[in-house]
């Protein structure tokens, strides 16, 4: 089901519809039968992060975040059309459950936070975007205390350091994570892919690439993608260890840096097969 939620069947370029556009009763302006709700988009984002699909999770998260300056500044609206990037007239412009679905995917998804105040434990299972070198989350509540978390990439590891609360126990669900002194050291994948999601112009229909699935093997990364037939798309590649000699099937890896050189990103370009509407493509990286 996660593949379908990430696909154009459910996902527009501005969020996730509440049902498939292939059912007989689909209506893109119906409140419950085809409109796009940021509430559902946020739920899908959290589910994708928990299923270790951070590219789709980040895309849906940033769609919700982008809505905070689309209508009333700082607020997220209640619902939009399921066919065109347009707010529906009966949508509440400041809908609390929509705004909550900006925060929840960030904290519970991207940063992977889980609380157990009874034993003063914070579980941290982050899946930061490949283009992020550092991040800080401030004033995280834990029982009667608050703490800050600093995230810093160091080669093939992500270092998570807490400050501000005594006696906090950090743990993680990510494989290989361990405490080193006062910090949590989390192994990073050898290869990561970055995406820069953007909202389309107002009134647009759905045209952007969709990342349906991502599968990390010992020395491979396979992406299942969906895009408009014959279109070209670009992602970015990050290598967290030297000398990997990454090869790509059905894609071309550029030699020049993408963006700031210190991020270590290189462009990945690929073309979808010819066809009407959305078609699928699989891209595999090996090293």
Give residue ranges: language-model regions.
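Broad hydrophobic/π-residue packing in well-ordered secondary structure
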Residues: 37-39, 142, 152-153
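Non-catalytic C-terminal accessory domains or segments of carbohydrate-active enzymes
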Residues: 119, 123-150, 158-287
């Amino acid at each position: 089901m996660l593949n379908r939620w990430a696909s154009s069947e459910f996902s527009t370029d501005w969020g996730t519809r509440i049902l498939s556009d292939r059912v007989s009763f689909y209506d893109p302006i119906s409140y419950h039968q085809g409109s796009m709700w940021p509430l559902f988009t946020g739920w899908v984002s959290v589910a994708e992060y928990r299923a270790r699909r951070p590219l789709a999770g980040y895309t849906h998260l940033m769609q919700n975040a982008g809505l905070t300056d689309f209508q009333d500044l700082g607020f997220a609206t209640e619902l939009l059309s399921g066919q065109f990037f347009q707010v529906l007239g009966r949508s509440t412009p400041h809908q609390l459950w929509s705004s909550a679905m900006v925060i929840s995917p960030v904290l519970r998804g991207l940063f992977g936070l889980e609380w157990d105040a009874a034993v003063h434990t914070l579980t941290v299972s982050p899946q930061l975007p490949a283009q992020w070198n550092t991040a800080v989350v401030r004033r995280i509540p834990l029982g009667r205390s608050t703490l800050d978390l600093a995230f810093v990439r160091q080669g093939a590891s992500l270092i998570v350091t807490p400050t501000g609360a005594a006696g906090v126990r950090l743990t993680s669900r990510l494989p290989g994570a361990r405490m080193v002194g006062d910090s949590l050291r989390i192994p990073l994948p050898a290869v990561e892919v970055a995406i820069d999601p953007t909202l389309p112009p107002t009134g647009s229909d759905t045209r952007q690439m969709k990342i349906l699935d991502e599968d990390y093997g010992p020395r491979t990364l396979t992406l299942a993608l969906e895009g408009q037939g014959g279109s070209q798309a670009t992602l970015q590649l990050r290598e967290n260890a030297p000398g990997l000699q990454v090869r790509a099937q059905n894609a071309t890896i550029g030699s020049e840096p993408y963006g700031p050189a210190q991020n270590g990103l290189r462009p990945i370009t690929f073309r979808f097969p010819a066809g009407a509407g959305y078609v699928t493509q699989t891209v595999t990286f090996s090293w």
